[in-house]
From Swiss-Prot:
Enzyme Commission code(s) on record: 2.8.1.7, 4.4.1.16
Signal peptide: none
Organism expressing this protein natively: Dickeya dadantii (strain 3937) (Erwinia chrysanthemi (strain 3937))
Pathway: Cofactor biosynthesis; iron-sulfur cluster biosynthesis
Protein name: Cysteine desulfurase
Amino acid sequence: MNYPVEHYPIDRVRADFPILQQSVNGQPLAYLDSAASAQKPLAVIDRERDFYLHEYAAVHRGIHTLSARATSAMEEVRAKVATFIHAASAEDIVFVRGTTEAINLVANSYGRTAFQPGDNLVISEMEHHANIVPWQMLAQARGLTLRVLPITDDGELDMAQLPALLDERTRLVAVTQVSNVLGTVNPLAEIIRQAHACGAKVLVDGAQAVMHQAVDVQALDCDFYAFSGHKLYGPSGIGVLYGKSELLQAMPPWEGGGAMIREVSLTQGTTYADPPWRFEAGSPHVAGIIGLGAALDYVSALGVDAIQAHEGLLMRYALASLAEVPTLRLYGPVHRQGVIAFNLGRHHAFDVGSFLDQYGIAIRTGHHCAMPLMSRYGVPSMCRASLALYSCQDEIDRLVAGLHRIHRLLGE
């Protein structure tokens, strides 16, 4: 169901999240740190608990009823994920611990076979460290050149620079769909078009996008897509890597162990399972997978379009309200999604965040695992408030009031 904006059931939604009902430092909790990790609805908590109470067993390893039931439940979630991001097949979905592991899997598997010394790959200046460091490591190990697409002062990718970074030896472009600091929504269709035109593949970091907007990996025509469950109202420790079937089929395994093999012989060597199981060595986080399925059900029941409209209204309200705070500097473009980065005068982000915490307001402070982006703006850290499907206008009002109060107390 997609609710009209004026009928978005915010009170009911907030009631679904028990943690939001508490007080912090004597004040009602205003949780504005969902970009770091989102809170969990009762539907997810109850489903995971019920799985442990009544269904838990090792998957893909037993013929008994509980094992078969747990295996079936896990594979149903794989199919549910495929439907949620419009993948062609459930077998294009690999379960991992999170976005970071998904990117490392591509770097250590696809990277081992697709790159030769002298090749290059392209990332952007706004990437999370998880989409920088694995490629630096691969470049060092394989003798590659890592090229960087810069950003403009407004926090947009400088797309005019992209053609000069792409050539016949570009093997991969790795880019975020939405910046975890600036909220910039990147022009993926154009990036993918240009990359494919020179024969390069594209990996999309969807960690900050999949909870805010509909994702269609086939329409995007991306080659890899990664996201985490804990930012999508699901459990921690579970994530997803989508890969085009022909790429996954050609990739060697990264980790070895149980479940990812077809045949093991001490004399003949080992043959490997087909994807996606080839990339799922060891015992999976099956309860987390079940919880992720419940999170997808919850989001789908509300409607992604309704969530996006609700958050869009809140974002516009927040940006307009924050613009009235003296000495506050906003970072990033006007049109953004999910997050608002700012600093208050000359005050360190840590101090601002500490004061807000005393008022019951939770935000993120620091470099946000994006040190190159901090360097681009010449600051060591930023404050970041982030929105979710349970965010409300009262939380924005309290954030703005808290910042006004800090300005009065501390001055410029």
